[in-house]
Amino acid sequence: MSHRAIWRESIARRKYAIVFEDDAVIRGDVRDVLPPLVSQLADNWDIILLGYNTNSILDLKLSDGGIDFRGHFSVQYPTLVQLSAFVASKEAVEIYKLNGAFGLCGYAISPRGAERLISTCFPMDKRVIPIPALGRSIVSSGLDSILNAFFRQVSAYACFTPLVVPINDPSSSSVLQA
């Protein structure tokens, strides 16, 4: 099922949805950790990234004073050993306002968020998207890149440390590259 189809289902049922892509590696404690994090936000959130690709940037808002975290991961493509350790991890997780990230390996979306993102992301096109954490703009190549144009405009959040990471193996990816 496509992301957009899941979003439409969320809207139709007026229910929140949690989405995991087929290459998602999920921490073993996600069921214990996620509900208290979400409850911190009350009901005014659109999307919460539970994880993101480790081969690109993560850009989080730390304060209203303009202090952001912009970083890269030490391992772009985790090994199976590293992914196994991740599943067993019990590192502290907090939730932050999201400015930018790539990858949709795992996320929660509200019906309101689904409506807002469907109306802003589709139809998908080759729009130019500024990525401040990269210091440049990119031409969108998929839904996760298009979302970067809207994370700052909607109530988007991300878990850090992540609760989900993708296998993200470029040799077996089903994502078409130009």
Question: What spans do the regions from the language model cover?
Answer:
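An acidic/histidine-cluster motif and surrounding catalytic segment
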Residues: 1-20, 24-178
